[in-house]
Amino acid sequence: QKYRPKDGETGLPVLKIKELRQGICDASSELCSPSIKSEYIIHDGDIIFSWSGSLLVDIWCGGTCGLNQHLFKVTSNNYDKWFYYLWTAHQLDRFIAVAADKATTMGHIKREELEKAEVIIPSKCDYKRIRTLIKPLFDLIISNRIENRKLTALRNILLPKIMSGEIDVSDIDL
């Protein structure tokens, strides 16, 4: 890890392909300094594209973390996250095929291949109409994933305490 936490700093977990696949950072995740550039800090709802090894794209909802060099944070100043997430996901099979054709040991996609990807931009009127349908669903996916992460953490804290008898639930009516 290039940007390790300095003495006294509470490190940020590093988002690598393993964490992207499992949807969370865990105790085995490497740590980086929280003083890294803001563009390398990942937040819930960010779109992450893995370009090396395992090519995949996902909506990160695993909490704040630092970005590994084998991942891109996909952003746009002009379009909503749902738009560029869906287009990246649409292109993924082509990216995987290109990477497989060029793989010597580990497949990866080069920036020039990403730049060749074609995207159909709807008219402003159509974009707004599509946005009213898709954005609420996209926001709900993010919200549900975050809630799922929080509920999983709560379960992982409470279940051992209930199983050991530290917390008594025998009087709870269900």
Predicted region positions:
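Sequence-specific dsDNA recognition surfaces
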Residues: 1-5, 11-44, 66-67
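Basic side chains
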Residues: 2-4, 16-18, 73, 110-111, ...
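Enrichment for repetitive, rod-forming helical segments
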Residues: 8-11, 23-25, 50, 117-118, ...
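A short beta-sheet element
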Residues: 16-17, 35-93, 99-104, 110-111
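Short conserved micro-motifs at the rims of enzyme active sites and ligand-binding pockets
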Residues: 26-27, 61, 131
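Short, contiguous acidic/charged loop-to-helix segments that flank catalytic cores in large enzymes
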Residues: 32-35, 74, 138-142
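Amphipathic alpha-helical coiled-coil/heptad-repeat segments
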Residues: 79, 86, 90-94, 100-103, ...
